[in-house]
Amino acid sequence: GLENLVMGGGPCACNPEPIADFFDLFFLGEGEEVDLEVLDLLGIAKRKGWSREEFLQKAAQIEGVYVPSLYDITYHEDGTIAAITPKNGAPATIKKRIMPDFDQADFPENFVVPFIDVVHDRAVTEVLRGCIRGCRFCQAGYIYRPYRERSVDVINRQAYDLCHNCGYDEVSLSSLSTSDHSHLADLMEKMLVWAEPEHVDLSLPSLRIDSMTCLLYTSPSPRDTR
């Protein structure tokens, strides 16, 4: 049946093979679209009474979905892979999913907030994805390529809506390297227009000293930009 499907994804699944035997499918790449497509397919499968195998064969046709059971892998004597053979119409190459237009990536702006103190008790908006630095030790800088920025207007609107809808008094501009956003100074100016009178803090994690601008020193939020 279709109960207890085990699905994986995210950075920990960028190399799924060591745990492939324990999963029905993996999402490769970014999940804003592919997870919804798989869930829609699962709804159809349940309504039509598909078997588990039928569902997985259909899911494998969705770009960014890897179904380990649909591939036979043979190895050389030294343990390296000799051949990967797809079965039952599974694609020979699985292409990871990305959001080419980052402004169109789905982002929650109105959700239930916890009624307890939590560690990251603030609104978070993702200002860019990927990184221009290419540090060799950084997994995230490679798996989130290509580098994409959200536009100033979209970030500003998301941050404003999050604070007004959810009651937060702090918003974090999240990314791998926020200070590398090409329009950060313009973004800060626009956000301070509403953040300052409403006493909303602006938090900028992942700053690099070589790309910070004078604006970040001279235009703090009401309780000091961090």
Feature annotation, model-predicted:
Residues 11-12, 142-155, 179-186, 199-216:
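Canonical radical SAM enzyme core domain
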Residues 68, 74, 79-124:
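N-terminal [4Fe-4S]-dependent radical SAM core
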Residues 1-87:
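Glycine-rich beta-alpha loop elements in corrinoid/cobalamin-binding modules
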Residues 5, 170-172, 199-203:
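Structural preference for beta-strand elements that scaffold enzyme active sites
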Residues 217-226:
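Single conserved hydrophobic/aromatic residue that forms the stacking wall/gate
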Residues 164-195, 209-212:
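Conserved glycine-rich "GG(E/T)P / GGGxP" loop and the immediately following alpha-helix
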Residues 113-137, 163, 204:
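N-terminal pre-triad scaffold of radical SAM enzymes
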Residues 21-23, 120-125, 136-146, 168-176:
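Glycine- and acidic
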